[in-house]
Regions:
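Short, solvent-exposed loop/turn motifs
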Residues: 50, 107-108, 238, 295
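Eukaryote-biased recognition of intrinsically disordered, low-complexity regulatory segments
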Residues: 33-57, 142-155
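Extracytoplasmic
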Residues: 37-39, 51-53, 62, 96, ...
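Secretory targeting signatures
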Residues: 1-33, 201
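Surface-exposed patches in mature extracellular/periplasmic domains of secreted proteins
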Residues: 54, 74-84, 182-191, 289
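Hydrophobic, secondary-structure "cap" segments at the distal end of domains
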Residues: 65-115
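Residue-level recognition of short, solvent-exposed, well-ordered loop/turn junctions
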Residues: 59, 118-119
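Solvent-exposed alpha-helical segments and adjacent loops
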Residues: 119-296
Length: 296
C-alpha cells in the first residue's frame, strides 16, 4: 500500500534540499558577488594557512599595503616597502619566519605598495617559515587562481587525466565550466603548448609527466611528493594516500614567478584521489595544500 508523506515533512525536506543547493553554489558565486560590490577580501593567516587570524572585506582600487593598514596594525621597513610585523607578529630572522602575501593564490611578484587590488581579489597575508619551503602559490583560496587570476588576468583551463581518474576529472570539469573557459583531455593528448599557455589541472599517478613534476617538488615548494606507491612529506614520512598541490607553471617560459598560469597536480592512490577532489570542490581546504591518507 502506498502512503503519502505528511505535508509538513515534505516541506521540511524541500527546505533542506534548497539550503544544500545554496551552500554548494554560494561559494562558487562569491567571486562575482564580491566583484559586483567593488569589494575584495583580505585574509591574515599563520603557518601556511593553518590558522586564520582575520578575514575582512576591503575596498578595491587601493594598494595591498593600504588595504592591510586599514584592517591591521602594520610595521614596515625598507622605505615602507617590506612588511615586518602584522598585529604584533614580527619577522624572525633566526627562525626564518616572515610575512608573505598572495593574490588569488599567487605569491605576488611586486611589492605590496605596487599591487592595486581588483574587485573580487582575495589577498592573503601568511606568516610562515621559509627555511624548507619557498611556496610560489597556495591552494587554500581555490578556485580564485582560475576564476580571477593575477592582476585581473586569467588563462583558459585544461583538465588533464590518466584513464584511472576519468570520473574525478569529469567532476572537476563540470564544476569549473560554470565559471571559466575549460576543456578536458586525456593525458596522451596533452601537448607542450597546452602546458605552456594554459592553466592545467592534472590528475594522475604513473605518467612520465607526473613523475617529472614530482621530481621538482623541492623547487616548487611542495610539502608532499610521490615516491613509487607512496606519498612522502618533507620530513620523509610515508603515507598511502593522495594530495593536491599547486604551483605557478614550471612550463611557462618566464618561470615560476611570472604570476601567469597555474598547474594543479592531484596525484596518488586511487582510493584517496576522489576524497581529495571532494575536499577541493566543497571548499574544505584548511591549508596551502590537501593530503588525505594513512601513515605507514
Amino acid at each position: 500500500m502506498n502512503r503519502k508523506l505528511p505535508t509538513g515533512i515534505i516541506s521540511i525536506i524541500v527546505i533542506i534540499l534548497l539550503i544544500g543547493l545554496f551552500l554548494i553554489t554560494s561559494n562558487l558565486n562569491n567571486t562575482q558577488n564580491v566583484e559586483d560590490e567593488g569589494k575584495a577580501k583580505i585574509i591574515i593567516s599563520l603557518n601556511f594557512g593553518e590558522k586564520i587570524l582575520k578575514e575582512v572585506m576591503v575596498e578595491s582600487g587601493i594598494s595591498v599595503i593600504d588595504a592591510l593598514k586599514s584592517v591591521a596594525n602594520v610595521s614596515l621597513a625598507y622605505g615602507g616597502k617590506f612588511v615586518v610585523s602584522i598585529d604584533n607578529i614580527s619577522s624572525d630572522l633566526k627562525e626564518q619566519r616572515d610575512w608573505f602575501y598572495y593574490v588569488n593564490g599567487f605569491l605576488a611578484n611586486v611589492g605590496a605598495a605596487d599591487y592595486i587590488i581588483h574587485p573580487g581579489d582575495v589577498v592573503r597575508w601568511d606568516y610562515h617559515c621559509w627555511k624548507t619551503l619557498l611556496v610560489n602559490s597556495e591552494l587554500q583560496d581555490f578556485p580564485y587562481m582560475f576564476t580571477k587570476g593575477y592582476s585581473n588576468k586569467t588563462y583558459p583551463l585544461v583538465v588533464v587525466y590518466e584513464p584511472t581518474f576519468r570520473n574525478e576529472a569529469e567532476k572537476i570539469y563540470n564544476f569549473m565550466k560554470k565559471s571559466v573557459t575549460v576543456n578536458i583531455v586525456k593525458i596522451e593528448n596533452l601537448t607542450r603548448e597546452i602546458l605552456e599557455r594554459n592553466n592545467v589541472i592534472l590528475l594522475g599517478k604513473s605518467s612520465k609527466l607526473v613523475e617529472e613534476i614530482n621530481s621538482r617538488y623541492d623547487e616548487l615548494g611542495w610539502k608532499y611528493h610521490l615516491s613509487g606507491d607512496y606519498v612522502v612529506d618533507i620530513h620523509g614520512k610515508k603515507y598511502r594516500g593522495a594530495f593536491a598541490q599547486i604551483t605557478q607553471s614550471p612550463y611557462n617560459s618566464k618561470g615560476i614567478g611570472a604570476c601567469e598560469n597555474i598547474l594543479l597536480l592531484i596525484a596518488g592512490n586511487e582510493e584517496y584521489v576522489g576524497t581529495v577532489v571532494d575536499i577541493l570542490l566543497n571548499y574544505k581546504i584548511d591549508s596551502f595544500w590537501v593530503m588525505e591518507g594513512e601513515p605507514l
